[in-house]
């Protein structure tokens, strides 16, 4: 079941992220969180996210506007490291509440509450028409990079903010997509450096012992397939129905994470 869930999410969402407001991590991180601790889920998602985005760079990276990439990705990289360090700090904090539900021990930690809040906020953004065309003036691109990078490093959730701030950069569709992909690679490399230095080396045994390495590889391959098919077959997709489904799923996952069920 774990392979089915991870592979299905990675394949479906990877193709759609070329054209949609949400990113691969928005759904893949909660999917990994069903089977692993939050910090391991975030790091595992980052590996799939990075390798998938490198593949996307090969497909569409030549269209990127590197002037915009520099303005957005430099502050994003710095703040991604800050967010990743904060995530590491959260892993050292003692649980707030522990309880038993249906014979299973559920734990509520500050880390889970914070990430659950972010997931619910992104769910509301997906569900509300008010945020459907959310965008910011081009002068705020560095600020957008900083915010997107910070939340990417902390939770893996960054796609919606990246889209909102880059959509007003005056780029054609091809340049817009290429710029987003290259910027995402910069953020992924930055946060993975911190994950590797801090908790991921410590928690890798958790991933390995529970079959997570195979899940990461399978998720990566399925994400490659989804990105390839998406880049070849999809020209323009109306995302509203998909956004509603995504929003509902995120809302349920956010509530489950916040309550300690996940």
Predicted features, each with a name:
Residues 1-36, 126-180, 217:
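Selected transmembrane alpha-helices and immediately adjacent juxtamembrane segments
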Residues 2-3, 32-50, 106-117, 146-156, ...:
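Structural signature of hydrophobic alpha-helical transmembrane segments
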Residues 3, 46, 116-119, 123, ...:
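Residues within membrane-spanning alpha-helices of integral membrane proteins
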Residues 35-38, 73-84, 141-154, 187-189, ...:
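Small-residue-rich segments of transmembrane alpha-helices in multi-pass membrane proteins
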Residues 38-44, 67-71, 170-183:
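Membrane-interface alpha-helices at helix entry/exit sites of multi-pass transporters
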Residues 43-102, 189-237:
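Selective hydrophobic functional segments
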Residues 53-59, 84-96, 112-137, 228, ...:
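Transmembrane helix exit motif
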Residues 66-77, 136-145, 178-181, 242-247:
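Cytoplasmic-side transmembrane-helix entry/capping segments in multi-pass membrane proteins
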């Amino acid at each position: 079941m774990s392979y089915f869930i991870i592979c299905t999410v990675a394949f479906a969402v990877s193709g759609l992220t070329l054209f949609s407001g949400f990113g691969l991590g928005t759904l893949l991180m909660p999917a990994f969180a069903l089977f692993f601790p939050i910090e391991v889920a975030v790091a595992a998602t980052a590996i799939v996210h990075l390798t998938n985005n490198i593949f996307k760079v090969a497909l569409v990276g030549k269209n990127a506007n590197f002037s915009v990439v520099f303005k957005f990705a430099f502050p994003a990289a710095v703040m991604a490291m800050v967010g990743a360090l904060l995530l590491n700090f959260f892993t050292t904090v003692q649980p707030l509440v522990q309880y038993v539900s249906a014979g299973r021990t559920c734990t509520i930690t500050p880390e889970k509450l914070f990430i659950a809040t972010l997931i619910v906020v992104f769910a509301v953004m997906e569900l509300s028409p008010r945020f459907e065309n959310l965008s910011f003036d081009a002068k705020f691109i560095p600020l957008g990079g900083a915010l997107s990078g910070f939340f990417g490093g902390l939770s893996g959730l960054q796609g919606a903010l990246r889209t909102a701030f880059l959509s007003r950069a005056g780029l054609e569709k091809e340049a817009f997509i290429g710029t987003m992909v290259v910027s995402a690679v910069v953020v992924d490399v930055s946060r993975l450096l911190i994950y590797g230095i801090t908790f991921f080396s410590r928690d890798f045994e958790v991933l390995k012992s529970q079959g997570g390495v195979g899940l990461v590889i399978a998720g990566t391959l399925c994400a490659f397939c989804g990105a390839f098919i998406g880049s070849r077959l999809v020209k323009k997709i109306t995302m509203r129905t998909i956004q509603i489904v995504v929003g509902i799923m995120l809302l349920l996952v956010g509530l489950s994470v916040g309550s300690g069920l996940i």
